[in-house]
């Protein structure tokens, strides 16, 4: 079965356009009823009134919105900066668990949200179209790929159609980027510099991504940039740069390099690219792709947010450099909220890192039935006994597993839904909203806060 969503509509439209001569960019979809929304120049004193059972109000100028979009097929985060600048960090595109056997030894996926018939890229696209601010004009100012795994940037499979002129498979990042003009495309750089064990296995998914990036550069002027580790001027507000000086995005890590805490300097503990290539994929010292993940520190006033892709510490007892969280911990501080590294699974979110971060709110983007893990959530609770845990998915199998391991599921604030953090313009407080993910109405099912920032 092939997906019959928006992605297929793109193909038909592009075929018509190609007959007019020359390659043309596929147009962004206009949201019915939102062509010219009324924008108030006044920053409200409190968050727009969000009521349980009603659709979450749209972003307001001055606020920082962080949306965890739940497709059940990976990880995707949509950011709206205080001036309306938009950024999509990852667009998970693993195959739906309902139609894909992940193989012996691998845990099955969770149910697709809202259902398996809507491609993950379409779920993400619909979400962005609904919440995107007027100032963005239906485009993405930034699109970022944390690392080169299918549950973050997509996979190539006959399940998905191909772009008629670009030749790339329309899934995940490529599908969203074909529909919405992208200003800058940010990633860790070339797949083989440094290489991970995944690079030796297959470059098919990465090659598809590169093909999309080249098409986007030609068709819509997208600029692909390697994340500059240590920089705080690469991801900035582009619509009203002077709107506030209390907002900052610091690039903490990418490609195995980590900010040192001094200026914009970065360093790596990994073997050189030449050494890693010489090792080959089977060498015990070889690093997995997760270690190459992009990590960011996002700040608005006293509010701090940490996101680290699939950063982990697996294998550190033998090879210390495989613990990418250790050097990150040295340059971080306590945060109000964070995305759990690697979907809150095992061998990640170390006690050493959490002793520094001590988040008040944890968002776990789980998409397999072994996520989140009891021992990992317990580490969060030990670091901050008051932490609120929000998971995008929790299967019945995992509920039974957690219970058998003595973890109280009632300790979790949410076990399904899109999770939205909305930070007040002052950066002094924030709210958390859980949105119903069983359809695309974006109604609030739970509301929390305000939480004060320290």
Residue ranges and their predicted role:
Residues 32-33, 38-65, 71-73, 127-130, ...:
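Flexible, acidic/histidine-containing loops and adjacent segments that form or flank the divalent-metal
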Residues 186-187, 317, 323-418:
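Long, structured stretches of catalytic cores involved in phosphate-ester chemistry, encompassing
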Residues 82-87, 93-185, 327-345, 356-362:
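Active-site metal-binding motif and surrounding structural segment of the metallo-beta-lactamase
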Residues 94-96, 150-154, 192-194, 258, ...:
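Short acidic, S/G/P-rich loop/turn micro-motifs used as interaction or catalytic elements
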Residues 16-19:
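C-terminal motif of bacterial Sec signal peptides marking the signal peptidase cleavage site
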Residues 21-24:
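Bacterial signal peptide processing site
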Residues 1-8:
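Bacterial N-terminal signal peptides that target proteins for export
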